[in-house]
Amino acid sequence: MTKSELIEKLATRQSQLSAKEVEAAIKEMLEQMADTLEAGDRIEIRGFGSFSLHYRAPRTGRNPKTGTSVELEGKYVPHFKPGKELRERVDAINT
């Protein structure tokens, strides 16, 4: 599902909101989440999951075109850990 598909679906379900209002709300929510992670803080949405930063240590990688070794710096990357309710709903698909 793309962001525009999500906006369309939410606007249909919430008839009191226009698509523009839903779009503004989603954009603001995503911006707030990005700002929170950028500040190094964790985001927890109970029943859904949590977003945090994980550190990737420096390592030696390879240039896919030339095959030469390249030293990659350590960096923080966003990480999502699904909550119990979300895991259970997804697991139900497999049974």
UniProtKB/Swiss-Prot annotation:
Pfam families the UniProt entry points to: Bac_DNA_binding (PF00216)
Presence of keyword Transcription regulation: yes
Cellular component, GO annotation: chromosome; cytosol
InterPro entries: Hist_DNA-bd, Histone-like_DNA-bd_CS, IHF-like_DNA-bd_dom_sf, IHF_beta
Record GO biological process: DNA recombination; regulation of DNA-templated transcription; regulation of translation
UniProt cross-references to PROSITE patterns, sorted A to Z: HISTONE_LIKE
Molecular function terms, GO-annotated: DNA binding; structural constituent of chromatin
Keywords recorded for this protein, A-Z: DNA recombination, DNA-binding, Transcription, Transcription regulation, Translation regulation
Presence of the UniProt keyword Transcription in the record: yes
Domain of life, source organism: Bacteria
NCBIfam families: hip, PRK00199.1
Role of this protein: This protein is one of the two subunits of integration host factor, a specific DNA-binding protein that functions in genetic recombination as well as in transcriptional and translational control.
Assembly and binders: Heterodimer of an alpha and a beta chain.
Similarity section: Belongs to the bacterial histone-like protein family.
Protein name: Integration host factor subunit beta
Protein's organism: Shewanella halifaxensis (strain HAW-EB4)
Gene: ihfB
